[in-house]
């Protein structure tokens, strides 16, 4: 017979949510940094053809 699981505590829920949000923050920061370096021409990982 199926037994319902115990409730996740509020503190555990907040910790998991914070970890999830922090991952998104760092990903967006890296993407912004890469876009900034591409726009200024200082990128070392991408080669962008310049249009004259």
From Swiss-Prot:
Q: Which UniProt keywords apply?
A: Chloroplast, Plastid, Ribonucleoprotein, Ribosomal protein
Which cystines does this chain contain? none
- Specify the domain of life of the species encoding this protein: Eukaryota
**Which compartment or compartments is the protein found in?**
Plastid, Chloroplast
For this protein, what is any one GO molecular function term? structural constituent of ribosome
A GO CC term assigned to this protein in UniProt: chloroplast
* The protein's name: Large ribosomal subunit protein bL32c
GO BP terms: namely: translation
Q: Which family does it belong to?
A: Belongs to the bacterial ribosomal protein bL32 family.
User: Which gene holds the coding sequence for this protein?
Assistant: rpl32
Q: Which Pfam families match?
A: Ribosomal_L32p
């Amino acid at each position: 017979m199926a037994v319902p699981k115990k409730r996740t505590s509020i503190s555990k829920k907040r910790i998991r949510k914070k970890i999830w949000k922090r991952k998104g923050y760092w990903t967006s920061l890296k993407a912004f940094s890469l876009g900034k370096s591409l726009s200024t021409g200082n990128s070392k990982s991408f080669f962008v053809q310049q249009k004259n």
